[in-house]
Amino acid sequence: MKLEIVTPEATLLNSEVVSVSVPGINGEFQMLDNHAPIVSLLVNGTVKFKGGAIKIEESFQDKFTKVDGEYQLSINSGTIEMKENKVIILAD
């Protein structure tokens, strides 16, 4: 599936991933390939994602950490939409 992470400053990521975990209002939840469509609010926490060939632009690499093959990005809040196997995260 495609993951796009957008902040007010820039689009930080636009890459293929196999899973995405996000901090929802009622706790963390995960989306895998072909997940049902969803729109949800995100709270302060960590966005986590995995994939085989994730490409992060050099100028944004300092915003992400990698732990045990999983990329992580801290956010303050945001919104997530998954539709037609594409995840868009608008994050602060």
Task: Give the residues covered by each predicted segment.
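Compact, glycine-rich, soluble single-domain proteins
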Residues: 2-92
